[in-house]
Amino acid sequence: MSKEVLTQTKEKMEKAIAAYQRELATVRAGRANPSLLDKVTVEYYGAQTPLNQLSSINVPEARMLVITPYDKTAIGDIEKAILKADLGLTPTSDGNMIRIAIPALTEERRKELVKVVKKYAEEAKVAVRNVRRDANDDLKKLEKNGDITEDELRASTEDVQKLTDEYVSKIDSVTKDKEKEIMEV
């Protein structure tokens, strides 16, 4: 029984790390990356539609994104959505496609992005700790119901703590890498 709880705990912690890494992908580090626009939604025929469903997004060079809409009539709406997303990006259109030059990051902007990364890291750690709390609660219920002994409870709780420590250190490692990437000029 306690093995099942540990397996579920590990899966949930993996999901928390994966979600954190997806969040980090949207943080700009000076390079052009299509995932920068993942959170951009466009008002398209009355519905909020993700930009990546309305167009293809390419990276022709290190500091340039090119958006080619499937429907050319949506270009104006796409430009508005990018500006509204407050990513610090300025789209320019030639009627067929939208180009976004990725500006070099200022020192001030780099520091802001590092703060954002740290906030995401803290949220990920909280998610991992919540998984730990839930797992410990499940283990206590198993012990209360007589499915596991007190010794098994203690051993399993220690295993859950080891998992928590492992995933928190993974988050710290990923965070350090991202901070280094952001602060690189």
Swiss-Prot record:
One Pfam family, short name: RRF
Keyword Cytoplasm in annotation: yes
GO biological process: translation; translational termination
Localization, UniProt: Cytoplasm
Null allele phenotype: No sporulation at 37 or 47 degrees Celsius.
Gene Ontology MF annotations: ribosomal large subunit binding
Gene Ontology annotations for the cellular component aspect, listed alphabetically: cytoplasm
Domain of life of the native organism: Bacteria
Keyword Membrane set for record: no
PANTHER family documented for this protein: MITOCHONDRIAL RIBOSOME RECYCLING FACTOR PSEUDO 1 (PTHR20982:SF3), RIBOSOME RECYCLING FACTOR (PTHR20982)
Function: Responsible for the release of ribosomes from messenger RNA at the termination of protein biosynthesis. May increase the efficiency of translation by recycling ribosomes from one round of translation to another.
Family per record: Belongs to the RRF family.
The name this protein goes by in its record: Ribosome-recycling factor
Organism: Bacillus subtilis (strain 168)
